[in-house]
Regions:
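Bacterial N-terminal signal peptides that target proteins for export
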Residues: 2-16
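Alpha-solenoid helical repeat scaffolds
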Residues: 31-290
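Intrinsic disorder/low-complexity segments in short proteins, especially the signal peptide
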Residues: 10-11, 20, 47
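Sec/Tat signal peptide C-region and signal peptidase I cleavage site
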Residues: 26-30
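Bacterial N-terminal signal peptides
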Residues: 14-25
Length: 290
């Protein structure tokens, strides 16, 4: 038999193996009758054939119906994979929710995937509950790794404030375990967005105790104090040090201008703010110039 004639045979064998891989474990546990098992295998085969023919929607729908009927998370997982491959994030997300709901609570992979898909869909607030559930099942090292992944996704958020508030709620679950300075800084900024200025200040001071030359933390703490018009001398000292460490940073120069304005040094403040705006014409800097 030529290798060309063997291709359909191996293709059919592959489909059968997929069906058995998905169906066999759960049906063995459930101890259903042979007729029901045969029907399920047929439906899986039909779905995979439909998928190969370009009928991804039909394959997806069949897998989702089967997942609900047989309470089998692996069928929902397969539907999710079809949704992702087909470039249908909403369908993939719906399947991921079903996968997570049907899976044993001890399994973390469905939660990881669900959280990622929710965040990529800019549904940060919806991601809070499954993300917290995931963190509670992880060890400290795993928690920090998960938070680092979420931190990287903040840059893709359409609504940064909403994303940071959600990040704060999630990260608060693991705060005692966070050691990475970058994560602590993001946690501090998220605390500010969530309205917890006390937590922000405490976290920034924690960073500075370990690294007194962290320019971003110096600037963030100093600006927060200046913006609230409190501890202005400390704010000036913090921002001045940050400026010395990063003299070309327009946002730090903006903070320096702002604290000088709070201190009544209006001429110097205006000069620094205008210079900062010239370096980076951002709306936040322009607002300080007035």
């Amino acid at each position: 038999m030529s290798k060309f004639l063997l291709r359909p045979y191996f293709k059919g064998l592959r489909l059968l193996l997929i069906a058995c891989w998905i169906i066999a474990p759960s049906f063995a546990i459930a101890q259903v009758d042979d007729a029901q098992t045969g029907k399920a295998v047929f439906e899986v085969l039909a779905s995979e054939i439909a998928l190969q023919r370009g009928e991804a929607g039909l394959a997806y729908s069949t897998y989702m119906e089967m997942a609900r009927q047989y309470k089998d998370p692996r069928l929902a997982q397969r539907a999710m994979e079809i949704g992702i491959t087909g470039g249908s994030p909403e369908l993939a997300l719906n399947a991921a929710k079903t996968w997570e709901n049907l899976s044993p609570s001890s399994q973390t992979k469905p939660k990881e995937v669900l959280v990622t898909l929710l965040i990529l869909s800019n549904r940060w607030s919806e991601a809070v509950k499954p993300a917290i559930a995931l963190l509670k099942q992880q060890n400290p090292s795993q928690r920090e790794s998960t938070l680092a992944q979420l931190q990287a996704l903040l840059a893709k958020a359409k609504d940064e404030s909403d994303a940071l508030r959600a990040f704060y709620e999630i990260a608060s679950t693991a705060k005692p375990d966070i050691k990475d300075p970058s994560l602590l800084y993001t946690y501090a900024m998220s605390a500010e967005k969530a309205g917890h200025l006390d937590v922000m200040e405490k976290t920034l001071r924690e960073i500075l105790r370990k690294n007194p030359n962290d320019a971003n933390s110096l600037n963030a703490l100093g600006y927060s104090l200046a913006d609230r018009n409190i501890k202005l001398q400390e704010a000036f000292a913090l921002i001045t040090k940050a400026h010395q460490l990063s003299p070309k940073d327009s946002f730090i120069l903006d903070s320096l201008g702002w604290v000088n304005f709070r201190l009544g040094k209006n001429t110097l403040a205006l000069e620094q703010l205008q210079q900062a705006f010239k370096m980076k014409p951002e709306a936040d800097i322009a607002a300080h110039i007035g």
